[in-house]
């Protein structure tokens, strides 16, 4: 058995937890409507939610993920001008994620990350999510950036787990073979299946 030198973390449900905070979610909905110039917040969010369903079906069926601009231009607000969408797409995606809950590092997560790094492991994040900027901003703001040697996001590479290529990309960026890496995640169908297919 190979000695483990690298560890990949999933985010949602593993390293980060979403908490239902009504005031936080309502503020995100208001900001989205403001950015879009929509006078009726509830009607606007109902429309976005309805349009998100076929996007989600496509993403799960095809193991693909759209970047911020494509998400809004093709799926959620296709009637809006290109210039407007390019201006607001990143914040719209961020706020839509906030509308789904307030996220924070799982209890004990920082201690685990620090402990592994101190023992010489190379660390990476491999996650399926919409939003190109949120995770990089979060890592900077919470001063976690120095602990991670690579971050592979479906919204940036445009493929989703269980596609093993996400894990192969992570291994290449760590400079390690898949057999030298481990994956910490919560979803058997997406995370564990993808990692095993990549020989992690």
PLM segments and residue spans:
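Glycine/Thr-rich beta-alpha phosphate-binding loop at enzyme active sites
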Residues: 150-162
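Substrate-recognition/cap helix-loop segment adjacent to the acidic, metal-dependent catalytic center
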Residues: 110-124, 129-152
């Amino acid at each position: 058995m190979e000695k483990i030198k690298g560890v990949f973390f999933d985010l949602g449900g593993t390293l980060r937890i979403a908490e239902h905070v009504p005031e936080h979610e309502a503020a995100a909905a208001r900001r989205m409507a403001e950015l879009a110039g929509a006078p009726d917040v509830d009607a606007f969010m109902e429309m976005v939610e309805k349009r998100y369903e076929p996007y989600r079906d496509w993403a799960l069926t095809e193991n693909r993920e759209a970047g911020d601009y494509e998400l809004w231009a093709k799926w959620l607000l296709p009637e809006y001008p290109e210039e407007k969408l390019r201006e607001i797409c990143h914040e719209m995606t961020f706020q839509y994620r906030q509308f789904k809950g307030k996220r924070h590092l799982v209890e004990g997560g920082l201690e685990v990350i620090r402990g592994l790094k101190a023992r010489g492991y190379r660390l990476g994040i491999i996650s399926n999510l919409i939003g190109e900027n949120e995770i990089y901003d979060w890592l900077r703001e919470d001063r976690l950036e120095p602990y991670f040697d690579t971050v592979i996001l479906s919204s940036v590479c445009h493929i989703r787990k269980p596609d093993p290529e996400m894990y192969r990309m992570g291994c290449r960026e760590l400079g390690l073979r898949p057999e030298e890496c481990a994956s910490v995640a919560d979803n058997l169908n997406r995370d564990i299946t993808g990692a095993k297919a990549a020989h992690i």
